[in-house]
Amino acid sequence: MVRNCLSIVLAAGEGTRMKSPLPKVLHKIAGLPLVCHVIKQIELAGSLQLAVVVGSGAEDITKVVQSFTKNAMIFEQKERLGTAHAVLSARLALQEEVDDILIVFGDTPLIEHSSLVRIRAFLADGADVVVAGFYASDPTGYGRLIKKNGKLITIVEEKDASDEEKKVSLCNGGIMALNGKYALSLLNKIDNNNMQQEYYLTDVVSIASRQNLNIQVVEIPFDNVIGINNCFELFEADALWQKRKARDLMLSGVTILKPESVYFSYDTEIEPGVLIEPNVYFGPGVKIQSGAVIRAFSYLEGAVVGRDAQIGPYARLRFGTELERSVKVGNFCEIKQAKVGEFSKINHLSYIGDTEIGTNTNIGAGAITCNYDGFNKHKTVIDDDVFIGSNSVLVAPLSIGKGSYIASGSVITEDVPINSMVFGRARQVIKEDRAIKLRAHLSKNKRNK
C-alpha cells in the first residue's frame, strides 16, 4: 500500500544572524535557494503534498517557492511563537487525511532524500513519532535525545539539560515525522509553559511518551541536518555540497583534475568520459556530453556542450548556447544564444551572439557578431563550410551562404550568397618614403609646443 505524505517546511525564521536583507532561506548554495534544496529532496522522497510556513520575507519566499514547485501550499506564521506554533500555522493542511507528516526546516539544504525515505519507512513499520538524530563527538549546543530503557522519552535543549543529560551524545537533528492519525492531537497538547513562552515542537516526544505511543529514533549523517545561521555557515554548507557533487561525478566516470577548484550548480549534468581542468565554474542549466574537455578558467551557464567538444581555456558560454559534436571554442571567446554545428571552430578572441553556425565552419581570431543596435537584438546565420577571416565584423541581421569566404578585417553588412568571397574593407594605399616626411613634420610640431 502506498502511503501518502504531507511535508511541512518551516521557513518563517527571521535569520537575523545572516545580517542580510535577503530572507535566510532564499540565500543560495550551488545557485539554488536553501528552501528549494529542501523541497527538491522532499519531492524525491515521494512526498506529494507540501506546505511551506513563511513569516519574515513572506512575499519573497512565496514567490520563489511557487516558481520552483506547483505543489506548495503557503501558510503564514503571523507571530513568532515557536516551532510547534509554526507547524500549526498549517492547520488546514494537517486536517486533511494523510498517512505521514514530515516536518523539515527550510534552512537545512544538505538533507538527502534517502534519509527522508528511511524516516518514512519507520512510520510504515508502525512508529507514531520518528525523530532524526545523530551522534556528535562534541554535542555542545545541541538538543539531547534522552532515552529510558532504550526508548526515547524526551528531547532536552542544551540550556535546560542537567549535567548528566549533557553527557548524552545522541543529538536532535530537527527533522520529525508523525503518524497522521495522531499529529493534530499531539500538536494541540503542546503548551508554552517555559522561560521563552514558546510552543516547542520537540515537546511532542514527551507528550507521545506519556501516551505510550511508539517513538523511534533514526540516526542520519550529521551533514544532513546542518542548519544555516550565518554567512560563514552558508559557505561551509556550500563547500560540503560541492564536495558531494564532485565525488558523485568522479564515481560516475567524470575526470576532475582539481575538484576543490571547480564550482557546480544544483542542476549541472555531466556525462561519463568528460575531462574538467582546474578553476571551472558551472552556473545553472549546464549539460556536458561524453568526451568533452572543459579547460581551465572557463565559465559556463545555460549551455549544452556536445560530445567530444573542447572548451577553453578562458572561455565563456552564456545562456542559450548549444554546441554540437566536436565543436571547439578556444581562449577568450564568449558565446551567447548561439547554436554551433559539429566540427566548427571558434578558437580565439571572438564574441558570437544570437547566431546560428553550421557544420565545419571556422571563425577566425578576433571575429565578432554585432547583434545589438541599442534597442533590439538581431540574428546572424552562418551556413556550413564557411571561413570567417580574422578580425571580421558581422553586422546583424545577416546571412552568410554555404562555402563562403570572408576576407580578414572585413565589415560585413549585407547577406552573402553561397560560395562567395567577400572583401569588406578599404583598399590598401602605399606611399613610399612618406613616413620620413611625416616623422619630420610631427617632430617639428612637438618642439614648437
UniProtKB/Swiss-Prot annotation:
The active site is at H348 (proton acceptor). Residues 253-449 are annotated as: N-acetyltransferase. Binds 1 Mg(2+) ion per subunit. InterPro entries: Bifunctional_GlmU (IPR005882), GlmU-like (IPR050065), GlmU_C_LbH (IPR038009), Hexapep (IPR001451), Hexapep_transf_CS (IPR018357), MobA-like_NTP_Trfase (IPR025877), Nucleotide-diphossugar_trans (IPR029044), Trimer_LpxA-like_sf (IPR011004). It holds the Pfam family NTP_transf_3. Keywords: Acyltransferase, Cell shape, Cell wall biogenesis/degradation, Cytoplasm, Magnesium, Metal-binding, Multifunctional enzyme, Nucleotidyltransferase, Peptidoglycan synthesis, Repeat, Transferase. Residues 1-231 are annotated as: Pyrophosphorylase. Catalyzes the last two sequential reactions in the de novo biosynthetic pathway for UDP-N-acetylglucosamine (UDP-GlcNAc). The C-terminal domain catalyzes the transfer of acetyl group from acetyl coenzyme A to glucosamine-1-phosphate (GlcN-1-P) to produce N-acetylglucosamine-1-phosphate (GlcNAc-1-P), which is converted into UDP-GlcNAc by the transfer of uridine 5-monophosphate (from uridine 5-triphosphate), a reaction catalyzed by the N-terminal domain. In the N-terminal section; belongs to the N-acetylglucosamine-1-phosphate uridyltransferase family. HAMAP family: GlmU. This is Bifunctional protein GlmU. The gene is glmU.
